[in-house]
C-alpha cells in the first residue's frame, strides 16, 4: 500500500513531512492514517538531528480539504464516532507536544480537519494565492470541528472570532487570516517552503497577542464578560436556526466548557458532542446533500454525450435576469459575453448591475480594481445583432411572451451558427412550445435561473423531446462554469421547482383568505425551516408574477393549480410587492429594520386577521402539497431521481436542508403517514389534497425512496 506521508531530512536539520494521498486530487484525512502518522512522529522524536518540522502538501492546489466525510457513514453508533474524534485528538496532541518547532506551510484549501491539523502545529504560514482559504465548515454538515478545533481556535484567535468562524463555516482569505492571528505570515507560493523552513530554524515563538477591540478585551478577559458572549451567541443561534439545527448550540457549549474547565475537559466535551451530531438525523440529511451535489458534479446530464466548449455567450435582454446571467458568465465562468437589448437603457442597466457586483469584491478587498476592470472588459453590448455570429450559446431572458420568444429563436437561427444553442430562461412556458419556431429544435433548451442570479445556486436545464444530448451536456457544463448547481428536468409547465412551489404558495394564500394573519403564516413556515415565509416570498418575487404563472399551470396541469382569488384582489389594488413598494408588507426608509405588515391588505382581501391555528398545522398544510407534487413530478419523469428532486427543492426554493429535501423528508415521515395526512385534508378541503398514485402504492408496499 502506497504511503500518504513522506518524511525527508534537510542538511540544516529541518525535516519536511509531505502529505499526498495517493490517487486523489485533494488531500483528506482518513482514520487509517493514524498509525502511519504516529510511526512518523515516533521516528522524529527518536532522531536528535531533527531541529524542526515543516508540514506541507504534495498536491498542487490543496493543503488538506478536511476529513473524509465518508468515514462518518461507517460509524454505526455514537461510540464509533466518539472513538474517531478521540483518535484525532491523540494524533494532534502528539504533534503539538513535539519539543521541536512544527510549522504548517499552507497553500490551497485548508479546511475542517485540515485547519485543525494546522492549529496543532506551533506556527502557520500560508501562500497569498486566491486558492488558499482557511476555515472550519463542519457546521454546514450539521457537525462541529471534532479534531480539537473548538479548543485550539478560540485560544489562538479569541472567542468571538472563533465562534464566528465555527458558527458560520465561513472561509478566510490569507490577508484576513494574518490580521486575525490565524497564521503567522503570508508569502508568495514560490517562497512558501523556504519561509516555513526559516520559521522552523528560528525556533518556537510565543504567539503574538491578538489585536482586540477594547470591548472584546473586557468581555473575553473576565468570566462575566465571557458569559455575555456565550449568552448572546446562543440567542442569535436560536433566532437563526429556529431550533432546527443542533450543531451551533453544541459548538458554543464546547468552547464555553473548554475555556472554563480547561483544554482536556474541552476535548472530552468536543468528542461527546461530535459523536451525538454524527448520528443525528439532521447531520445525516445534510451529509446526504453534500454527497448528492458531489456526485452530480461528475455527471454530464446526458449519458454518453460530450459537452462542446463554450468560448462565447450572448444574453438577450438587459433586465435584472439578463444582467445577472451576464455577470456570472463573466465573473465566474470567465467567458466573454455580448448583451443584446433593444434599448441603450437596458444595456446600461446590465453593465451597471455587473459593475456593482464586482465593485463589492473590490470594496471587500477580495479583488483589485484591475481584476474588476478586466472582468468588465469581457462584457460588451449591442442594440442590434452585431458581434453574435460566433456565439456558442445564446441565453434568452426577455418577457414571458411566446410570440416574442419565437421571434428570438428565428433571429438567432438567422444570425448565428448552426451549432449555436438557444437557451430560454423562461420560468413557465413549455420549451417545446418555444422550439416550435426553430428549424433546429435540437439546439433549443431551457435554462431556468432563479433570482437573484448571483446568489441562487440552482439552475434547471430543461430538455424537450427533440433536444440533443450534446446540447444538454454543453448547457450543463456551461451552468457549472457559472458556479451553478444544474439539475436536468424534462419539459412541462412550471418544470419542477415552480411546479412544487406553486401548490405550496397557493395553499398559503388559501390560509390567508381563511383569516390567518400574514405574520402568523410567515413565522410558521420559517419555524418549519424555510429561509422566508411564503407571503414574504410572494412580495419578493412579485404578486403579478405569481398571477401570470398560475393560469399557465392551471391550464396545463389541472384544477388543483387554480390560484385563490387573492391574486386578483391584490392586483386590483395595484399591489405587486416590493417592486412597486406595495404588497403585504410596508416598504420604504422607515421599514428597513423592522418589517411590518401593511394592515390595509386585510381590507382588500375582506378578512379579519387571526392567529387561531397552530403553527405546525399551518406549515403542514402547505408542505404536504409540495411533497405530493414532488412525487408526481418523479412519476411523470419531470425529474430523473429523488436525489435531483431533493437538490432542486433545497437549492431552488430553500426547502429546509436539515430535512434532506422533499424525498428524504417523505422517507422520514413514512409514505403511509403522509397518505393518511393528505387524505385527512382531502376530506376537509377537497381533491387538491388527493395523494398521487405512487404515494399510495408506496404506502401499501411499505417502501421508501432511499
Curated annotation (Swiss-Prot):
At which residues is there a site annotated Important for catalytic activity? 116, 138
Q: Which reaction does it catalyse?
A: a (3S)-3-hydroxyacyl-CoA = a (2E)-enoyl-CoA + H2O; a 4-saturated-(3S)-3-hydroxyacyl-CoA = a (3E)-enoyl-CoA + H2O; a (3S)-3-hydroxyacyl-CoA + NAD(+) = a 3-oxoacyl-CoA + NADH + H(+); (3S)-3-hydroxybutanoyl-CoA = (3R)-3-hydroxybutanoyl-CoA
Q: What is its main location?
A: cytoplasm
Q: What UniProt keywords are attached to this protein's entry?
A: Cytoplasm, Fatty acid metabolism, Isomerase, Lipid degradation, Lipid metabolism, Lyase, Multifunctional enzyme, NAD, Oxidoreductase
Q: Where is the protein situated, by its record's location annotation? A: Cytoplasm
Gene3D superfamilies to which the protein is assigned, alphabetical: 1.10.1040.50, 2-enoyl-CoA Hydratase, Chain A, domain 1 (3.90.226.10), NAD(P)-binding Rossmann-like Domain (3.40.50.720)
Q: Which GO terms describe its molecular function?
A: 3-hydroxybutyryl-CoA epimerase activity; enoyl-CoA hydratase activity; long-chain-3-hydroxyacyl-CoA dehydrogenase activity; NAD+ binding
Record SUPFAM superfamilies: 6-phosphogluconate dehydrogenase C-terminal domain-like, ClpP/crotonase, NAD(P)-binding Rossmann-fold domains
- One of the record's GO cellular component terms: cytoplasm
Q: Name one Pfam family in it.
A: 3HCDH
According to its UniProt record, which protein family does this protein belong to?
In the N-terminal section; belongs to the enoyl-CoA hydratase/isomerase family. In the central section; belongs to the 3-hydroxyacyl-CoA dehydrogenase family.
Which function does this protein serve?
A: Catalyzes the formation of a hydroxyacyl-CoA by addition of water on enoyl-CoA. Also exhibits 3-hydroxyacyl-CoA epimerase and 3-hydroxyacyl-CoA dehydrogenase activities.
The entry's protein name is Fatty acid oxidation complex subunit alpha
Biological classification of the source: Bacteria, Pseudomonadati, Pseudomonadota, Gammaproteobacteria, Alteromonadales
Amino acid at each position: 500500500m502506497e504511503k500518504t506521508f513522506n518524511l525527508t531530512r534537510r542538511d540544516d536539520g529541518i525535516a519536511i513531512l509531505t502529505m499526498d494521498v495517493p490517487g486523489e486530487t485533494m488531500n483528506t484525512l482518513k482514520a487509517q492514517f493514524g498509525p502511519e502518522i504516529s510511526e512518523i512522529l515516533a521516528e522524529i522524536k527518536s532522531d536528535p538531528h531533527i531541529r524542526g518540522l515543516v508540514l506541507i502538501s504534495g498536491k498542487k492546489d490543496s493543503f488538506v480539504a478536511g476529513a473524509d466525510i465518508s468515514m462518518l457513514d461507517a460509524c454505526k453508533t455514537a461510540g464509533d464516532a466518539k472513538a474517531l474524534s478521540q483518535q484525532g485528538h491523540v494524533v494532534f496532541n502528539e504533534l503539538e507536544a513535539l519539543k521541536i518547532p512544527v510549522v504548517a506551510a499552507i497553500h490551497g484549501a485548508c479546511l475542517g480537519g485540515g485547519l485543525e491539523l494546522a492549529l496543532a502545529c506551533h506556527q502557520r504560514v500560508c501562500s497569498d494565492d486566491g486558492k488558499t482559504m482557511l476555515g472550519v465548515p463542519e457546521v454546514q454538515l450539521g457537525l462541529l470541528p471534532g479534531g480539537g478545533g473548538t479548543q485550539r481556535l478560540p485560544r489562538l484567535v479569541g472567542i468571538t472570532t472563533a465562534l464566528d468562524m465555527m458558527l458560520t463555516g465561513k472561509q478566510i482569505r490569507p490577508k484576513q487570516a494574518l490580521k486575525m492571528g490565524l497564521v503567522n505570515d503570508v508569502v508568495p507560493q514560490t517562497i512558501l517552503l523556504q519561509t516555513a523552513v526559516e520559521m522552523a530554524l528560528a525556533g518556537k515563538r510565543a504567539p503574538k497577542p491578538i489585536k482586540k477591540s477594547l470591548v472584546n478585551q473586557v468581555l473575553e478577559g473576565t468570566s462575566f464578560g465571557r458569559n455575555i458572549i456565550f449568552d448572546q451567541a446562543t440567542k442569535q443561534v436560536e433566532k437563526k436556526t429556529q431550533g432546527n439545527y443542533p450543531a451551533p448550540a453544541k459548538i458554543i457549549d464546547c468552547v464555553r466548557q473548554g475555556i472554563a474547565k480547561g483544554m482536556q475537559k474541552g476535548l472530552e466535551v468536543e468528542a461527546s458532542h461530535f459523536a451525538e451530531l454524527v448520528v443525528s438525523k439532521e447531520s445525516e440529511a445534510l451529509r446526504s446533500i453534500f454527497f448528492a451535489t458531489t456526485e452530480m458534479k461528475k455527471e454530464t446530464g446526458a449519458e454518453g454525450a460530450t459537452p462542446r466548449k463554450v468560448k462565447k455567450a450572448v444574453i438577450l435582454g438587459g433586465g435584472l435576469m439578463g444582467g445577472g446571467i451576464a455577470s456570472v458568465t463573466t465573473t465566474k465562468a470567465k467567458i466573454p459575453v455580448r448583451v443584446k437589448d433593444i434599448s441603450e437603457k437596458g444595456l446600461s442597466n446590465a453593465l451597471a448591475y455587473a459593475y456593482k457586483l464586482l465593485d463589492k469584491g473590490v470594496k471587500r478587498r477580495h479583488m483589485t480594481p484591475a481584476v474588476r476592470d478586466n472582468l468588465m472588459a469581457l462584457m460588451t453590448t449591442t442594440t442590434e445583432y452585431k458581434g453574435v455570429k460566433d456565439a456558442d450559446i445564446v441565453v434568452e431572458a426577455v418577457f414571458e411572451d411566446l410570440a416574442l420568444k419565437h421571434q428570438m429563436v428565428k433571429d438567432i437561427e438567422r444570425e448565428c451558427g448552426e451549432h449555436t444553442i438557444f437557451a430560454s430562461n423562461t420560468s413557465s412556458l413549455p420549451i417545446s412550445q418555444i422550439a416550435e419556431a426553430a428549424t433546429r429544435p435540437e439546439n433549443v433548451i431551457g435554462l431556468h435561473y432563479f433570482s437573484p442570479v448571483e446568489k441562487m445556486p440552482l439552475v434547471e436545464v430543461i430538455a424537450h423531446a427533440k433536444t440533443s444530448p450534446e446540447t444538454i451536456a454543453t448547457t450543463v457544463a456551461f451552468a457549472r462554469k457559472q458556479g451553478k448547481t444544474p439539475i436536468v428536468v424534462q419539459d412541462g409547465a412550471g418544470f419542477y421547482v415552480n411546479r412544487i412551489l406553486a401548490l405550496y404558495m397557493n395553499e398559503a394564500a388559501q390560509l390567508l383568505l381563511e383569516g390567518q394573519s400574514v405574520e402568523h403564516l410567515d413565522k410558521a413556515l420559517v419555524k418549519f425551516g424555510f429561509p422566508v415565509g411564503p407571503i414574504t416570498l410572494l412580495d419578493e418575487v412579485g404578486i403579478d408574477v405569481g398571477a401570470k404563472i398560475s393560469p399557465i399551470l392551471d391550464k396545463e396541469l389541472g384544477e388543483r393549480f387554480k390560484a385563490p382569488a387573492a391574486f386578483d384582489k391584490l392586483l386590483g389594488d395595484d399591489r405587486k410587492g416590493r417592486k412597486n413598494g406595495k404588497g403585504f408588507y410596508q416598504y420604504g426608509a422607515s421599514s428597513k429594520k423592522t418589517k411590518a405588515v401593511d394592515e390595509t391588505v386585510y381590507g382588500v382581501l375582506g378578512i379579519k386577521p387571526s392567529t387561531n391555528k397552530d403553527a405546525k398545522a399551518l406549515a403542514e398544510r402547505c408542505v404536504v402539497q409540495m411533497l405530493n407534487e414532488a412525487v408526481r413530478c418523479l412519476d411523470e419523469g419531470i425529474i430523473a431521481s429523488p436525489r435531483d428532486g431533493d437538490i432542486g427543492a433545497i437549492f431552488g426554493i430553500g426547502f429546509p436542508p436539515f430535512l434532506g429535501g422533499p424525498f428524504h423528508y417523505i422517507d422520514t415521515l413514512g409514505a403511509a403517514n403522509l397518505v393518511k395526512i393528505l387524505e385527512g385534508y382531502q376530506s376537509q378541503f377537497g381533491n387538491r389534497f388527493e395523494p398521487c398514485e405512487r404515494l399510495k402504492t408506496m404506502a401499501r408496499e411499505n417502501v421508501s425512496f432511499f
